[in-house]
Amino acid sequence: SFSWPNGVKVINQCSFSIVKPGLWMLVGENGSGKSTLFRLISGAIRPKSGKIYCSFRPSMVYQNPDHQLLMPTCKSELMLSIPKNIPHSKLFDLIQSSLEKVELGEMLDRPIHTLSGGQKQRLALAGAIVSNSNLLLLDEPTALLDPQSQNSVLKVVKKLTSSSADPITAIWITHRLEELFFCDGAAIVKNGRIGEWNSGSKVFQELKSLALR
């Protein structure tokens, strides 16, 4: 559970687990606690009661990539995220590999300000990869993107979570219900609690039926 200093309870005895890699989506109304839950998982804030057990190395990706991309080029941006124990001789290969995984392999020296919104979001994903993160916390990563860029980000994340060699786990907050059809499981967040995990299509139909009432 978690409450803000003013006493407003945002997370209320929330309990859930993710047992395997994949793309898992959360949906819910504004103020239901989704983003606060991400901050708890990432360690940015601590729960007021209860515990969080996370064996993953989490990394946040936000709605607007401009808020987290700080350097002038793709290469210099990824240099910020590389763990300090990586030998200098391996830096280039690690950066290039991360860019290729998000389909930006030709963008090493590309100025970030020339990238499209979808490319910037994929660069943010590359930053998570190069940091050796294996848990992506994606807070509405396609909310500001056009349909083509939205699909490009979904495609990359789906590929990362279903890789046979080294799949990662992604938890994705969405308000775009059509995205639910891409996930391995989805749940509705309401009043600070997560409901049961179901297929994305089942959650989609449940939300559609609620909207028609």
Language-model-detected regions and their locations in the chain:
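Helix-to-loop junction immediately C-terminal to a conserved catalytic motif
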Residues: 42
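Conserved ABC ATPase "signature" region
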Residues: 89-107
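The feature captures the beta-strand-to-loop junction immediately N-terminal to the Walker
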Residues: 27-29
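Conserved beta-strand-loop-alpha-helix hinge in the C-terminal portion
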Residues: 193-213
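Catalytic Walker B motif of ABC-type/P-loop ATPase nucleotide-binding domains
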Residues: 136-140
